[in-house]
Curated annotation (Swiss-Prot):
CDD domains: Radical_SAM. Binds 2 [4Fe-4S] clusters. One cluster is coordinated with 3 cysteines and an exchangeable S-adenosyl-L-methionine. It catalyses: N(6)-dimethylallyladenosine(37) in tRNA + (sulfur carrier)-SH + AH2 + 2 S-adenosyl-L-methionine = 2-methylsulfanyl-N(6)-dimethylallyladenosine(37) in tRNA + (sulfur carrier)-H + 5'-deoxyadenosine + L-methionine + A + S-adenosyl-L-homocysteine + 2 H(+). InterPro entries: Elp3/MiaA/NifB-like_rSAM, Methylthiotransferase, Methylthiotransferase_CS, Methylthiotransferase_N, Methylthiotransferase_N_sf, MiaB_methiolase, rSAM, rSAM_horseshoe. The keyword Iron-sulfur applies. [4Fe-4S] cluster 2 binds at C156, C160, C163. GO terms for molecular function: 4 iron, 4 sulfur cluster binding; metal ion binding; N6-isopentenyladenosine methylthiotransferase activity. The gene is miaB. Its cofactor is [4Fe-4S] cluster. Keywords: 4Fe-4S, Cytoplasm, Iron, Iron-sulfur, Metal-binding, S-adenosyl-L-methionine, Transferase, tRNA processing. This is tRNA-2-methylthio-N(6)-dimethylallyladenosine synthase.
Length: 456
C-alpha cells in the first residue's frame, strides 16, 4: 500500500489543506497517510510564509529529504502552501530534486501534477489562483473524530502592510452558500458535532445563493449551519475587527450554538501603530465591538494576536498594548516579534528598535497573558462545563478528554464504567464539573446526573 507523508506549517487553513491533500491522493491513487517519511512514496511540505525565515526552513527540510530521494528514485517530493506560492519555480531551481510545486489554490491538481512529473521527467510547478475551483474537485471529507474544519472562503483583500497572505493566497473568494452547507451536512451525517469555519477573514464571507443573484453574509451562513441536524457547536477563525459587523454580534444573541469563544486579532494597542499596519480600525472601535459582544455574552472568552516590535514602536506604544491586554482580559494570544516579509510595504519601514528590547517586550506580554489564562482557568473550578468528548486522555488512556466552549482541554475519569461504554462516549456532549486547574488543562468529574445516564 502506497503512503504519503505531509508536514504542515502554520495556520488552521494549512491544517485543513493538508487534510485535503491527503484526501485527493487517497481518492486518486489510494495513498494512505504515514507519520514516517522513510516509509512514504510521496512526501509533501505544506508551508507557511507568515513567520521569519520561512523559506530557509523549507530548504532545510528539503535538504534532509535529498538523501532519501537518492535512495528511493521513485519518491515524489512536493512543496505546497504559501512559500510555494511566493517562490514558485525558484524552489526547483534551488532544489532540482523537488518534483512538484503547488499553491493553496491548486492542491486539487496534485494527482495530475504528479502524473505529469512521472510522464515527462520534468518538475511541475502550478502556483496559479484559479479562484474557488479547487473545492469543485475535492473528494468528500473523511471524518476523524467529532470535530471538523470547513473552509468557507480563500484569500484576503485587506492588504495589511506587514502581511504576505494576499500575495500568496490571493484575493478574497467565497465558496457558494449551498456548497458550504452541503459539506457541513455531510460531516454531521458522519458524526461530526462541532465545526470550525475557516478563512483568512471569515467576516468578509459573501457567498452566492443557488442560481440567484442573492448573496449570503457570514451571519446568515452561521444561522443556516446552526439548523443542520447533529451540529451542536460552531467555531470560526480567523476574523478581522474591521468587518466584525453588528449583524455578526447579534448572531451571538440568537444562535446558541456559537461557542463562548472568539479569536479576534487586534495586533496592537496603539492607534499610531495600527495605522502603520493598515489595519483599518482604531483601538476604541475594537473595544466597542468587544463591549457590545460581552453585553450579549458576558462569559465569552477572547483570544487574539499581537505583533511586538513593529517598526517605529515606542515604549509608549507598547504600554498601550499592555493597557489593552489588562482591559480586555485576553484568554490566550498568538504573539510574535515582527519580522519583515519580502514584498510587503512594511518591509521598507525604518526599524531602529534593538532586538533585545523587542524580546523583553514579548516576554512581558506573554507572561501577562499567561497570568490571564491561569486566572480564567482557576475561575472555572467548581463550575459545570459542557464538553465535547474527543477521545482518550493523552497521559492516561484509561481516562477521557474533551474540550470546553472556551477551548480548554478537560481530562476526566470514569472508573466505574466499562471500557466499551467509555469509548461510546467519544463524540458525545457531557456535563463535567471542574475540580482542578493546571497550566494547560483542567481536571473534571462527570456531573452525577450524567454519570447515571452514561452507565446505562
Amino acid at each position: 500500500m502506497k503512503k504519503v507523508f505531509i508536514k504542515t506549517y502554520g495556520c488552521q487553513m494549512n491544517e485543513y489543506d493538508s487534510d485535503k491533500m491527503s484526501d485527493v491522493l487517497n481518492a486518486a491513487e489510494g495513498l494512505v497517510p504515514t507519520d514516517t517519511p522513510e516509509d512514504a512514496d510521496v512526501i509533501l511540505f505544506n508551508t507557511c510564509s507568515v513567520r521569519e525565515k520561512a523559506q530557509e526552513k523549507v530548504f532545510s527540510e528539503l535538504g534532509r529529504v535529498k538523501a532519501l530521494k537518492a535512495l528511493k528514485p521513485d519518491l515524489v517530493v512536493g512543496v505546497g502552501g504559501c512559500v510555494a506560492s511566493q517562490e514558485g519555480a525558484s524552489i526547483v531551481a534551488r532544489a532540482p530534486y523537488v518534483d512538484v510545486v503547488f499553491g493553496p489554490q491548486t492542491l486539487h491538481r496534485l494527482p495530475d501534477l504528479i502524473a505529469a512529473r512521472r510522464r515527462t521527467g520534468r518538475s511541475q510547478v502550478d502556483v496559479s489562483f484559479p479562484e474557488i475551483e479547487k473545492f469543485d474537485h475535492l473528494p468528500p471529507a473523511r471524518v476523524d473524530g467529532a470535530s471538523a474544519y470547513v473552509s468557507i472562503m480563500e484569500g484576503c483583500s485587506k492588504y495589511c502592510s506587514y502581511c504576505v497572505v494576499p500575495y500568496t493566497r490571493g484575493e478574497e473568494v467565497s465558496r457558494p452558500f449551498d456548497d458550504v452547507l452541503a459539506e457541513v451536512a455531510g460531516l454531521a451525517e458522519q458524526g461530526v458535532r462541532e465545526v470550525t469555519l475557516l478563512g483568512q477573514n471569515v467576516n468578509a464571507y459573501i457567498g452566492k445563493m443557488g442560481d440567484t443573484s442573492e448573496r449570503a453574509d457570514f451571519a446568515l451562513l452561521l444561522e443556516y449551519v446552526a439548523e443542520i441536524p447533529g451540529i451542536e457547536r460552531i467555531r470560526y477563525t480567523t476574523s478581522h475587527p474591521k468587518e466584525f459587523s453588528s449583524r455578526l454580534i447579534e448572531a451571538y444573541a440568537t444562535n446558541p450554538k456559537l461557542v463562548d469563544h472568539l479569536h479576534l486579532p487586534v495586533q496592537h494597542g496603539s492607534d499610531r501603530i495600527l495605522m502603520a499596519m493598515k489595519r483599518g480600525y482604531t483601538v476604541l472601535e475594537y473595544k466597542s465591538s468587544i463591549r457590545k459582544l460581552r453585553a450579549i455574552r458576558p462569559n465569552i472568552s477572547i483570544a487574539t494576536d499581537f505583533i511586538v516590535g513593529f517598526p517605529g514602536e515606542t515604549d509608549a506604544d507598547f504600554a498601550k498594548t499592555m493597557d489593552l491586554i489588562h482591559e480586555i482580559g485576553y484568554d490566550t494570544s498568538f504573539s510574535f516579534i515582527y519580522s519583515p516579509r519580502p514584498g510587503t510595504p512594511a518591509a521598507n519601514l525604518h526599524d531602529d528598535t534593538p532586538q533585545a528590547v523587542k524580546l523583553e517586550r514579548l516576554k512581558h506580554l506573554q507572561a501577562t497573558i499567561e497570568e490571564n489564562v491561569a486566572r480564567i482557568s482557576q475561575g472555572m473550578v467548581g463550575s459545570v462545563q459542557r464538553i465535547l468528548v474527543e477521545g482518550p486522555s493523552r497521559k492516561d488512556p484509561t481516562e477521557l478528554h474533551g474540550r470546553t466552549e472556551n477551548n480548554r482541554v478537560v481530562n476526566f475519569a470514569l472508573p466505574d464504567l466499562p471500557q466499551v461504554r467509555r469509548e461510546q462516549l467519544i463524540g458525545q456532549m457531557l456535563d463535567v464539573r471542574i475540580v482542578h486547574a493546571f497550566p494547560h488543562s483542567l481536571r473534571g468529574e462527570v456531573a452525577e446526573e450524567r454519570m447515571a445516564s452514561a452507565a446505562h
